[in-house]
Amino acid sequence: MDVRRRPVKPLYPSEHISSGEPLKPHNQDSSVKASDALPLPLYLTNGLFFTMFFSVMYFLLHRWREKIRNGIPLHVLNFSELVAMVSLIASVIYLLGFFGIGFVQSFVSKGNNDSWDVEDESPEQFIDRTVTPPPVRRNIPMKSVPVAEKTAQIITPFSSEDDEVVIKSVVEGRIPSYSLESKLGDCKRAAFIRKEALQRSSGKSLEGLPLDGFDYESILGQCCEMPIGYIQIPVGIAGPLLLNGKEFSVPMATTEGCLVASTNRGCKAIYVSGGATSVLFRDAMTRAPVVRFGSAKRAAELKFFVEDPMNFETLSVVFNKSSRFARLQNIQCAIAGKNLYMRFSCSTGDAMGMNMVSKGVQNVLDYLQNEYPDMDIIGISGNYCSDKKPAAVNWIEGRGKSVVCEAIIKEDVVKKVLKTEVATLVELNMLKNLTGSAMAGALGGFNAHASNIVSAVYLATGQDPAQNIESSHCITMMEAVNDGKDLHISVTMPSIEVGTVGGGTQLASQSACLNLLGVKGANREAPGSNARLLATIVAGSVLAGELSLMSAISAGQLVKSHMKYNRSCKDVTK
């Protein structure tokens, strides 16, 4: 769905909502116009002055050319030339007054219009803002309105005392709830009216859903449609996480008790052991359209064409036109009968990149359509990408950022901080995360709770929480090193999908959390480095979470800690 910011449209007077009287569009106003005072019809008057303007201009130019040839001063005028000058000035004044003022007004109004697609709306919705709306008549019985007339009924710009009228109009279906922002010009007020209308129509209370304290303008056309408030998720801090020689305080938005505390303990164990090291070894967002041919042979021919290195440069140029940050890396094809799936991989700078890669894919599809006119484009996404679902292609080939993070935990730290033994941790990891996950038929789930940490960091930093599915693909490895005294732990995460620009990253709270990590916005000196750093921080946080939870399980502390920190004593039914 294409959601864009639309212009604020004034509405017709609210008294017509109560009375049920149909209104004439503003452009059908029957008021007296200045042109009514002209002695001739308007089209004849315009024609007269047009003819006068061009005639006298031709006459004067002809006379001036003769004066120049004969050496006569131009300012010396005879009677006919004087009459021509007066006629020229009169015609210019008339034409400028008739056409020029309207042009200037339209130019100024366009310059002040904060919209992208004014032409999308009907001109019948516009009225003169200088007209003061009449007072709203209360307690007047509603008249039945024919269906054909309902579409023309809308109300004037509302003042604060008119909220009740608007709410009733929304409840009764005369004002679409989705149009409140564009009609009112106040996003917060639109959210309030929508929320109140929903409570009345559903009969359910939304008292606990807050409305104040949020910038609804910031989500218009970008993050959420038809808002009625916002939810509150506590944000905790784990750390410092010592990663690649730098310290990070990791924000985690969660409602699960123990999660932040456990991750914080893991960060402490890593810190006192000398820190963790992470490496990003792949960076490529993917999109895989599906196309169909009349035969499998033709599908195979396109596969050979796309995968031919001789054609890759041409396809790259076409693809990279979509953005100055998009750079096509490779195209991987798969055939199913006469259907072809093409998995495009590209770097996307500091953006997560789904929109960017989709635009590039569309460019290539348009190009291929000319080369293969019998190609039928079924969909720009054929699930071979694969987005927001567990898939072996992501686990094997990766999607987004692929990161490995490791640390060596000292023996005394394992005993004093984690309250367990190295050998116990290694055995538990093998039987739980490896063998147990294999028995369950897990796909990318060879870990204890990577999704817990990924979800919490994603919510705090404005990432797409639905991409937690593939981003949480992780295999946790543990091994005794240094003669069995110390613990080597690592997490390998092939598809961390993050960005530091776009989407929810521009919201105030999420932007503050990104700023805390030092990755807010785009990195102009090294495009893409902020998003890559965020991916390594996610992996480092997962490493800390895995280390602490596995230690709690091996020491038999899991149930005890959750009974202490993860139980609610509040009766939510009251």
From Swiss-Prot:
Subcellular location: Endoplasmic reticulum membrane
Pfam family, one: HMG-CoA_red
Known glycosylation sites: N78, N113, N320, N433, N566
Keywords: Endoplasmic reticulum, Glycoprotein, Isoprene biosynthesis, Membrane, NADP, Oxidoreductase, Transmembrane, Transmembrane helix
Keyword Cell cycle included in the entry's annotation: no
CDD domains: HMG-CoA_reductase_classI
Entry keyword Transmembrane: yes
Segments traversing the membrane: 41-61, 83-103
Catalytic activity line of the entry: (R)-mevalonate + 2 NADP(+) + CoA = (3S)-3-hydroxy-3-methylglutaryl-CoA + 2 NADPH + 2 H(+)
Enzyme Commission code(s) on record: 1.1.1.34
Expression by tissue: Expressed in mature petals and anthers.
Region spans: Linker: 104-161
Function: Catalyzes the synthesis of mevalonate. The specific precursor of all isoprenoid compounds present in plants.
Family of the protein in this entry: Belongs to the HMG-CoA reductase family.
Identification of the protein by name: 3-hydroxy-3-methylglutaryl-coenzyme A reductase 3
